[in-house]
Amino acid sequence: MDKSKRLLLIVGTAWMIDALDVAILSFMMPLIKTEWTLNETQLGLVGAMTSFGMLIGALLCGKLSDRFGRKKILMGTLILFSLSNLALVFAPNVNWFMAIRFITGIGLGGELPVAAALIADRYTGTKRSQMLVLSDSFWAYGWILASLIAFFVIPHFGWRIAALLTAVLALYVFVLRKHLPDDAITHKQNTASFRQLFSPKHKWPLIMLSLVWFIVMLTYYGIFLWLPSVLVLRGFSIVHSLGYTLAMSIAQLPGYYLAAHLLAKMNPKKLLIGYLMGTILASLIFGLANNVTIILIAGAALSFFDLGAWGILIALTPSLFPHAIRGTAMGSAQAVGRLGAVIGPFLAGWLLDIKVGIGGVFS
């Protein structure tokens, strides 16, 4: 296996674990709603707390990785969110659940910008873009794995055992320690500041990227954290909703792979716009669909376009900033995006609570 494929597998697996943890929450939500008698607004707050932690993690860990190195901080984020999942197994009520998920979110949100910066440090041009999109494609594998756990474990053993399984993934840190290469560029003398980030050269790219990240995360977390719950609200059983979500999740993979292929042939900004338009159209159709076939097709299209757009954005963001502030820039842009991730789940829950309807939420 050549060095690029080896690095892709190592970093991509860490990315997959991050996605698994985010996804598994969406499958827990219908169960904790019943267990603790929550309404939709309260359930939306559960999702929002994880996203708020991810906001803090993205902002903090991106900066720390510029100062202390990508590898160390990446390992630290994995340990943090995996061990907090162990604590989640013993959560006695929803307040404890939300507090623990906030801590989990710090690790989850910190890992992604650090992993992206680690890849971006080693490549340039089209190769960098393709490596970043392919790394992000492991997010789909995380969702698929979470869907399988949800389908085969949660209905029979409950959500706490699912949380325990995610905690075991902390052991992957030993793989990172042994096999992840040391940082491509030394960080010992790096004293990059936010002042550099907001210099005339970097300010406007940061602002525009942050705005796009906000929109993408608002829609992604507002939709996908609620996906199994929305299917239950449509009248499907828990088991059927989990199975349908698994089918929709598989569609993320071709979305990523096509984006990686097209990045070598098209302007990434135009490609991103195309994927975002596809996301909007698929979301509208999904919200208005009233039979299983259309729900599955629209849901698959939504997965295809939304996650493909995410991959393109992952590739575009670090390419616009120099190494010295790359982690800080990536973390800052994603932190603004995480505001959308905080608002999205809560807003969706509130809209459902005031009887706007599923079509209104997805439009």
Regions found by a protein language model. Give the residues of each.
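Extracytoplasmic gate region of multi-pass secondary transporters
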Residues: L25-S26, H202-Y257
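Interfacial helix-cap and linker-helix signal at transmembrane-aqueous boundaries
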Residues: I32-K33, L64-S65, I149-P155, L231-V232, ...
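Helix-breaking motifs and short loop linkers at transmembrane-helix boundaries and internal kinks
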Residues: T37, G69, F90-W96, T124, ...
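Conserved MFS/SLC helix-loop-helix module at the cytosolic interface between two early adjacent transmembrane helices
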Residues: I56-V94
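Helix-to-loop junctions at the C-terminal end of transmembrane segments
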Residues: A58-G69, G255-N267, L352
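Paired small-residue
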Residues: L80, S84, N95-I103, T293-A301
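Cytoplasmic helix-loop-helix junction between adjacent transmembrane helices
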Residues: I100-S137
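Helix-loop-helix hairpin linking two adjacent transmembrane segments in secondary transporters
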Residues: G125-R128, L134-K178
